[in-house]
Amino acid sequence: MLSIFNIWGTFNRVLFFLSLTVSLAGLAGNTLLLWHLGLRIKKGPFNTYLLHLAAADFLFLSCQVGFSIAKIASGYEDTLYFPVTFLWFAVGLWLLAAFIVDCCLSYMFPSFCGPNCRPRYTSFVLCLVIWALTMLAVLLPANACGLLYNRMSLLVCLKYHWVSVVWLGVLASTACGASMFLLVFGNCCSSQPPSKFCKLAQCSGILLFFCRLPLVFYWCLRPVIKFLLPFFFPLATLLACIDSSAKPLLYYLKGRQLRKEPLQVALNRALGEESQSSSGGISLPMSRV
């Protein structure tokens, strides 16, 4: 029995330090990404989402590093660790869902939902609304369920938690469905190839499915999973850190054309909002008609 506890303790420590290492690397990448998106690249509807998403990932990884260092120093985990880190994680999930759905609608209906068919600051205003609403959607159930303080009201907790579970389920399923649509129909059923932002949405949707959904499941079923699968939370945390840290590398790889191309050139190519043709949309190639 003692050896089982030793194995579990070693496994938990390995996941903890892996998460810390990935978070530190992701902080460096998202810092560079924020600098390029914020100061060096002209803003447009799509890269506005990515700028706010990078900010949410930066805050998530910063809190991850800060609470991890505090745990190393004090020897115990702060009670605010999970609700605070999940807050920025949820902001990123909502922003990612908005970005993927916007790319999907622009691809399906370029004449009505394209970048040139909307008010200039639509994406910016939507991002601000997402930041504000996520604060309420996470902090209210966290407070009612005793995650922020030790006071808990069972009926109020169940009511708020049920609303947050439905909200997260709708966000995750919408984002996964839209990215799957872009992946299948964009590559098989259209004569117009997907734009670079649609391709980024496809890759981001795959990352979301494998790396973000586990932490969403943990939030929804926290008491049950914590009791039955104690290793699930550190593993889900590691996957969430990988997702938040991988995006700068993903953007660089999507924008790079030459082997030793400068970072700024690759990011400008991947995230710049140059004018794109509005002749997209879903249509069968002539060879298939």
Swiss-Prot record:
Membrane-spanning ranges = 14-34, 50-70, 81-101, 124-144, 165-185, 201-221, 223-243
GO MF term list:
G protein-coupled receptor activity
Give residue ranges on the Extracellular side: 1-13, 71-80, 145-164, 222
The chain's Cytoplasmic topological domains, given as residue ranges, are 35-49, 102-123, 186-200, 244-289
Glycoprotein is among the record's keywords = no
Q: What are the record keywords, sorted? A: Cell membrane, G-protein coupled receptor, Membrane, Receptor, Transducer, Transmembrane, Transmembrane helix
* Bilayer disposition of the protein: Multi-pass membrane protein
Q: Name one GO cellular component term.
A: plasma membrane
User: To which species is this protein native?
Assistant: Rattus norvegicus
Say yes or no: keyword Transmembrane helix present.
Answer: yes
Top-rank taxon: Eukaryota
UniProt GO BP: G protein-coupled receptor signaling pathway
The family database entries (InterPro entries) matched by this protein are listed as: GPCR_Rhodpsn, MRGPCRFAMILY, MRGPCRG
Q: Which family does it belong to?
A: Belongs to the G-protein coupled receptor 1 family. Mas subfamily.
Q: What is this protein called?
A: Mas-related G-protein coupled receptor member G
Subcellular localization is given as: Cell membrane
What is the annotated role of this protein in its UniProt record?
A: Orphan receptor. May regulate nociceptor function and/or development, including the sensation or modulation of pain.
Indicate where this protein is primarily found.
Answer: membrane
